[in-house]
Amino acid sequence: MLSAIVGVNWGDEGKGRIVDYLSQDFDIVSRYQGGNNAGHTVVNEKGTFILNLLPSGILRDGTVNVMGAGMVIDIEHLVGEIGRLREKGIEISPENLKISDRATICMPYHRIQDCLEEDRLSDKKFGSTRRGIAPVYADKYMKKTIRMGDLRDIDGIADHLRDIVEWKNLLIEGGYHHEPIDAEKMLTWLRTYGKPLLPYICNTSEYLSKAADEGKKILFEAQLGALRDIDYGIYPYTSSSNSIAAFSTIGAGIPQLHLDESIGVMKAYSTCVGEGPFVCELFGEEGEILRRAGNEYGAATGRPRRVGGFDVVASRYGARVQGATAIALTKLDILSYFDKIPVCVAYEIDGKRVDTFPTGSALNNAKPVYEYFDGWKEDISDCRSFDELPEAAKKYIDFIETRIGVQIKYISVGAERDSIITR
C-alpha cells in the first residue's frame, strides 16, 4: 500500500497531525520534497512538536522515517531538530531515520542569497521564508550543489565546492555587493554538521523498493499544498518544488511505483502564509477573530497567517491536481461559536461568475461570491463520530463534500492526537 498525505490549499492545512494519526497503520513515512521552509505541528501525550525537516512519523514508535531524494536539507537545522526531539524523549537512530544519499544540501550561502534577493525585491517580494529554498533548488538544476552522500568524502568534493563558491560569489559579491562567501568556512560547516548525520545516510531508493516488494505500507508526507506547487500553484507565489502527490514516489526514491491513494488535507476555513492572491481573505476585526481562534501563525516562521472563509473554487482545484481519493478536514472545532460562517462558492471576474480556478493575472482580479452557513454554539472537541456533531456542523461538512466532489473521510475536532472523526 502506497499512500500520500498532501495539502489541497496553500499549505499549513494540518498535514502533520493527519500523518501522525494515520502513521500508526503504516510501516514507513517518507518526506519527498521541500526543506525546512515549512513546519508540521503535532500534539501528542509527550507535548507539542514542530517538525521542519523530519517526517512526522518520527513521533511514532516502530515507524521508519525516510528523507527522500527530492528534499533539500539544511544539515545544521537537521542536527538541531534531532537534538531538540531527543531532549523531549523521542528516540532517533539509524533504525528509524534514513536519509537519501541523493538529497541536496541547503548551504549557508543559499540562505544568504535568499535574504538578499527578498530584500532587493522590497515591496515586490514573494514572501520567502528566507531559508534558502529557491536558491538551492535553482542550483540543483544548474548542477552546482552538494548532496548528502558527498558528506562521506568531503575532501573528495572540496575542489568542487570551491568552484561552486567562486561561481556563487559572482552573484553574492558582484550582484548584491555583499561580502564574499569563504569556501573554507563552508567546508568546515559541512564537516561539523555532516559528521553526526553520517550513520543515517544510505541508499533510500533501494530500501524503499525492497520494502514495497515485501508489502510494507508506505506513507508519503508532502510539505506545503497544491497552490504552492512550482508547476500547478499560483506562480510565482509558489515554493520551488513539486508538492503534488504525483511527485511523491519520484521524490521519495521509487519512481517506478504508483500511489494507491491520495489523502488531501484542507482546513475548514482558509489560511495562507506569504504573498500572492488570496481571494477569500478576511480583513480587520473579522479576520483577527478567526486568526486568534485558530492560533494561525506560521509554524516555521511565526508569521501571522492570512485567513478567510472556506474557498470551494481553490479547494476543488487543489483536490483535483492532487488526485485526492479522500479528504481530511482539519480544525472544524475552530468554527464553533461563530454566528455565520462564510463559504466562497465562486469567483466574480470582470463581472462574470467563474467556477474554475483561474491562472495568471485573472486571479488578482477575482472577487469572492459567498454563501453563509449557520454556526454551532457548542464544543465539538469530544465528538468521535459524525452523528455526534451538531446538525449545523454536519450540514457544513456535507455541503463542502458535495462541492469538492471527494469524500471527507477524516474530520479533526481538536488539537489532541485522537481528536479525529473517521467516517
Locations of regions flagged by a protein language model:
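Non-transmembrane, aqueous-exposed alpha-helical and coiled segments at domain scale
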Residues: 1-423
